[in-house]
């Protein structure tokens, strides 16, 4: 049986004694004493951190739905590129209970010490091995591209089981919110900048859009949504769009105005892990119709 905190060593030691073998003599009995070192390894922890979040799966609707009636569909997936730091959440002592010259127990780590830095791979997982038993704090420091940083730290404790269990395994899962996209156009009178209601715009894909598996789910030029300017001249596209290139075009001009053939380009990109919603707004102006008599 191994001491608490250690694992039984199943290896045998062969001892060969001859006239050349070093020994000590017992002072009382004069017996020869031969010393052999035999060590046990401490039990250790293995931490798996997994990163999850929504990934683009498809663009779907009913059986006869056209592109305007379809919605972007997301599913939970594994995320690569998340970076975590693992800290000691308490003083973590050696299992042998040894003390230093001042009588303090010897430590692997003091509370707050950085123990490991982990980065998730394609499977969304990262592993820290050979952690001394104790409690640790795990903090996300870098979110995957396209996602918002998860500010919630988690703790995990590795507790000794028995002398037959060399590795105690624990896991933590962190989820991230996708950075959302807000695209809008403000419709204005070109002469006095007053808002114009009643203009209809279409939003089109300006490039092929692919899902998480690399499959094209929307071809360039596809009409995705129509929206009408309100009393404030605001035209808001409300679907849950992924980051991509889009173009907005006026498809029905408001009464009393000249058609504007210009388009609004939205080259949307990730705005960093601290931004929940990437906002894109452009102004679009129409010239009033004039009459000469």
Q: Where do the model's predicted regions map?
A:
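Solvent-exposed loop/turn and edge beta-strand elements of beta-rich ligand-binding domains
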Residues: 1-293
């Amino acid at each position: 049986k191994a001491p608490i905190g250690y694992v039984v060593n199943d290896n045998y030691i062969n001892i060969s004694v001859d006239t050349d073998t070093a020994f000590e003599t017992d002072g009382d009995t004069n017996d020869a004493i031969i010393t052999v070192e035999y060590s046990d390894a401490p039990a250790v922890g293995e931490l798996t951190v997994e990163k999850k979040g929504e990934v683009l799966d498809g663009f779907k609707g009913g059986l006869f739905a056209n592109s305007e009636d379809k919605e972007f569909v997301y599913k939970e997936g594994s995320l690569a590129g998340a970076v975590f730091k693992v800290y000691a959440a308490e003083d973590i002592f050696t299992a042998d209970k040894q003390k230093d010259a001042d009588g303090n127990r010897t430590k692997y780590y003091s509370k707050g010490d950085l123990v490991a830095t982990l980065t998730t791979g394609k499977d969304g997982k990262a592993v820290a091995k050979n952690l001394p038993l104790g409690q640790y704090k795990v903090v996300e420091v870098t979110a995957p591209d396209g996602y918002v940083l998860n500010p919630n730290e988690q703790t995990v404790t590795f507790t000794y089981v028995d002398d037959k269990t060399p590795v105690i395994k624990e896991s933590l899962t962190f989820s991230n919110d996708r950075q959302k996209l807000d695209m809008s156009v403000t419709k204005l009178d070109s002469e006095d900048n007053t808002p114009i209601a009643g203009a209809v715009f279409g939003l089109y894909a300006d490039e092929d859009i692919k899902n998480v598996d690399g499959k094209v789910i929307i071809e360039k030029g596809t009409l995705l949504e129509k929206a009408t300017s309100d009393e404030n001249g605001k035209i808001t596209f409300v679907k849950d769009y992924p980051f991509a290139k889009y173009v907005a075009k006026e498809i029905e001009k408001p009464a009393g105005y000249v058609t504007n053939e210009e388009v609004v380009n939205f080259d949307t990109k990730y705005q960093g892990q601290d931004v929940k919603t990437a906002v894109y707004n452009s102004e679009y102006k129409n010239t009033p119709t004039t009459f000469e008599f």
